A protein has these predicted regions:
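Solvent-exposed loop and edge beta-strand segments that line ligand/cofactor-binding
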Residues: 35-58, 81-97, 137-151, 189-204, ...
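Residue-level recognition of alpha-helical structural elements
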Residues: 11, 49, 72, 89, ...
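Terminal, non-catalytic domain-edge segments
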Residues: 1-29, 212, 275, 324-335, ...
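Well-ordered alpha-helical scaffold segments within catalytic/enzyme domains
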Residues: 1-9, 58-69, 100-113, 154-166, ...
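Long, well-ordered core segments of solenoidal/helical folds
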Residues: 14-43, 68-87, 117-139, 172-189, ...
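Internal, well-ordered domain-core segments that constitute the primary functional module
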Residues: 104-175
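Extended ligand-binding clefts on enzyme/binding-domain cores
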Residues: 167-280
Length: 400
């Protein structure tokens, strides 16, 4: 099935129009900063950082690169300017040096003049990783040490694509992979006695990063065994079978299935299993991943719809998952995608500052301009629907 055939043309055009309108309202770094100031008054969480991929100008550079409007370079410059006041002294993907490198690498595909800066940024990233002393004692590990959002899994995703591959980059990637192999062994990613299953902070994200590296030929001793152990554990702690296969947010679990989302629970776990299946050629595992996501999307269609429209914990994240699975051959995801896309497009409200509001897990409703939990991420998702192909930025959500 071609990606272009996943949505009716009229719906794809509507998605593109909404994405363009969001892009217009975030057309300059000054507008984005003003939106961030407004959003900060609506929440008790501090989230906006100029150089951040998740909630900053780096993420908005991606927005404008993919909307086809020539504003991306202005946001790149704004992101680098922000580092003068708040230097990126940590390597993470969504909030650190790896994220800025990811955005700059994407923009550099159109703007080769940024390539020298990208090389320097990758060297900075490598040095930060080499200088990082991640804990290796059971019980001393926090999710930001290993996870996709802040830790070694997300950093691995970016280092796998770094070019040129210098000796420092090689050493840094080796350190990340070896740490993830250790974390994956015997449940070392437990935090306060709980093992997270999901993509953003749990086993699925670790597995996806290790699988992406494996597929690219970047391997260390024990990596395949770690993939097998993570996969076996995820399948063992899942509940039900076939289309009823689902996962709690953590093990042990306080309640049932995690809310439908990219970040936690069934959606992210299915994506992690799909990444492993594609890296190892395991068609049986691919079928189980397809069935698990199909079941989740069926439950969403029956009314279990996330309140937020955003990528992280909302509807846009489910659209990303459905598109990804459909493009890899899932008939269930292909059937579900138009309905999800239509719901996301219909939710847009031009009377709102950014057309969409994030419903935070704390209960706040926020006009967030960012990528992971805001309007920029929704616009990027809608642009992918409009163009009918998998955009490169999805790699930060679904490593491959």
């Amino acid at each position: 099935m071609s990606d272009a055939a996943l949505l009716p043309p009229g719906l794809a055009a509507r998605a593109g129009a909404v994405a363009d309108l969001i892009g217009e309202r975030l057309a300059t770094p000054a507008r984005a900063d003003a939106a961030a100031v407004r959003a900060a008054r609506q929440t008790d969480m501090s989230f906006w950082s100029g150089a951040s991929l998740s909630e900053g100008h780096a993420g908005l550079a991606l927005l404008h690169r993919h909307t086809g409007v020539d504003h991306a370079s202005a946001f790149v410059r704004a992101a680098f300017s922000a580092t003068r006041e708040n230097p990126l002294d940590h390597p993470g993907l969504f909030d650190g040096t790896a994220g800025l490198a990811f955005a700059l690498q994407d923009v550099s595909r159109d703007e080769s003049r940024f390539l020298p800066s990208l090389g320097k940024l990758h060297e900075q990233l490598a040095r930060q990783v080499i200088a990082t002393d991640w804990p290796r004692l059971p019980g001393s590990v926090a999710d930001h040490h290993y996870d996709l959002v802040y830790g070694a899994a997300g950093i691995t995703v970016q280092l796998c694509s770094a070019s040129p591959v210098t000796s420092a980059v090689e050493e840094a990637l080796d350190r990340c992979l070896r740490y993830l192999v250790w974390v994956a062994t015997a449940g070392h990613w437990a935090v306060h006695g709980r093992l997270d299953t999901g993509m953003s902070h749990g086993a699925a994200g670790i597995a996806a990063a290790l699988a992406a590296a494996w597929r690219r030929g970047r391997r260390v001793p024990g990596q395949r065994a770690a993939l097998d152990e993570l996969t076996a554990w995820l399948l063992a702690v899942g509940r039900g079978g076939g289309h009823g296969l689902r996962w709690p947010r953590t093990v042990p679990a306080d309640d049932g299935e995690a809310a439908p989302a990219w970040c936690h629970g069934t959606g992210g776990v299915a994506a992690g299993l799909l990444a492993v299946a594609r890296a190892t050629g395991d068609r049986g595992l691919e079928d189980r991943a397809f069935a698990a996501l199909d079941g989740l999307l069926d439950r969403v269609a029956a009314g279990d719809v996330p309140r937020s429209p955003t990528v992280c914990h909302g509807l846009a994240g489910l659209v990303v998952l459905a598109h990804e699975f459909a493009s890899h051959g899932s008939q269930g995801a292909a059937r579900a995608l138009p309905g999800l896309a239509r719901r996301l497009v219909d939710t847009a409200d031009p009377d709102l500052p950014l057309l969409y509001r994030d419903h935070e897990t704390t209960g706040h409703i926020v006009d967030n301009p960012g990528l992971l939990t805001g309007a920029a991420g929704i616009a990027l998702t809608l642009r992918a629907l409009a163009t009918g192909h998998r955009p490169g930025w999805w790699t930060v959500l679904l490593p491959q």
